Amino acid sequence: MVDATAPKKRTFKQFSFKGVDLKDLVEMPTEEFTKLCGARVRRRFSRGLDSKPMGLIKKLRAARAATEPNERPAVVKTHLRNMIVVPEMIGSVVGVYNGKVFNTVEIKPEMVGHYLGEFSITYTPVRHGRAGNASSKFMPLR
């Protein structure tokens, strides 16, 4: 019989990417990681990375090395919206440019394999249903 007064143990879902645990994913080389990804990501990495994405990764490494353990690293600003999030970037803080401002994005494990631009919206969503000039002209004036 289970004791009714005992607190329930909470179980948290462990993150895994295509069956690979987070700990193994972070230690995995990029070539091995690309084999787990979809065709678009594999194609992007097989064609090679030029100096700009590698420069971003170097800046993220430097920002992480400059911080103490269990602290948030400094924000690294970038215009590279087409950069694919790799496991090495998990825990970093990136300022992604949306055409106007840099939106601060903390890289979480669920973001692996997605583009940075997906996390920094470039437009203001439309708000429908608000009274504007056209609908207010039928209001009686005092």
From Swiss-Prot:
It holds the Pfam family Ribosomal_S19. One of its GO terms (biological process) is ribosomal small subunit assembly. It comes from the Eukaryota. Transmembrane segments: none annotated. Keywords: Cytoplasm, Ribonucleoprotein, Ribosomal protein. The keyword Ribonucleoprotein applies. It is found in: Cytoplasm. Belongs to the universal ribosomal protein uS19 family. Component of the ribosome, a large ribonucleoprotein complex responsible for the synthesis of proteins in the cell. The small ribosomal subunit (SSU) binds messenger RNAs (mRNAs) and translates the encoded message by selecting cognate aminoacyl-transfer RNA (tRNA) molecules. The large subunit (LSU) contains the ribosomal catalytic site termed the peptidyl transferase center (PTC), which catalyzes the formation of peptide bonds, thereby polymerizing the amino acids delivered by tRNAs into a polypeptide chain. This is Small ribosomal subunit protein uS19. The gene is RPS15.
